[in-house]
């Protein structure tokens, strides 16, 4: 697997780790001007789905994700609904991500005039941005912050263990 999809996989694992122990009540609390955690989950899922499932196939973003796209109004979806979108987006995009090579990363989508490698880096950064936001909201709600990033025994390919 190419290093960029591996980096996104690590980003997803950290995103998931910041959701551990979250209740529906806490996930739906909104501390303005931020969105609530459940909206953020669905918002990040929207990007994963769009970038790596729908757009490479030449389709518009799945309608279930559109309420959480860039610029969409704030809402407070149930945690389970947001998590279902997140799990589905990750599962459905894994096939593309696991097979992505230099040629696939160079492909330009018809919906966004950047290549998929650039969108992948954008998605990694976006996921980390919202991971930090979720961590901040959790702390404001009285939760303990997640410990420093877990690399899950990952090392850059080519480096000796």
Kindly give the residue locations of the regions a language model identified.
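Acidic/histidine-rich alpha-helical segments that form the ligand environment
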Residues: 71-107, 114-129
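Short, contiguous alpha-helical
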Residues: 5-9, 16, 24-69, 110-161
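N-terminal leader segment of winged-helix/HTH proteins
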Residues: 1-2
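A structural signal for long alpha-helical coiled-coils and helix-turn connectors
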Residues: 23, 97-101, 138
């Amino acid at each position: 697997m190419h290093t960029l999809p591996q980096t996104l996989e690590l980003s997803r694992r950290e995103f998931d780790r910041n959701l551990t122990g979250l209740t529906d009540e806490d996930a739906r609390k909104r501390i303005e001007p931020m969105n609530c955690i459940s909206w953020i989950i669905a918002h990040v899922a929207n990007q994963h789905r769009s970038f790596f499932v729908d757009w490479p196939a030449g389709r518009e973003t799945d309608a279930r994700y559109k309420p959480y796209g860039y610029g969409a109004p704030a809402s407070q979806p149930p945690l389970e609904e947001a998590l279902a979108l997140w799990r589905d987006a990750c599962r459905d995009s894994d096939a593309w991500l696991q097979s992505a090579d230099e040629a696939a990363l160079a492909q330009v989508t018809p919906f966004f005039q950047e290549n998929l490698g650039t969108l992948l880096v954008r998605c990694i950064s976006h996921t980390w941005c919202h991971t930090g936001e979720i961590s901040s909201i959790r702390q404001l709600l009285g939760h303990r912050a997640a410990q420093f990033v877990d690399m899950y025994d990952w090392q850059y390919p080519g480096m000796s263990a």
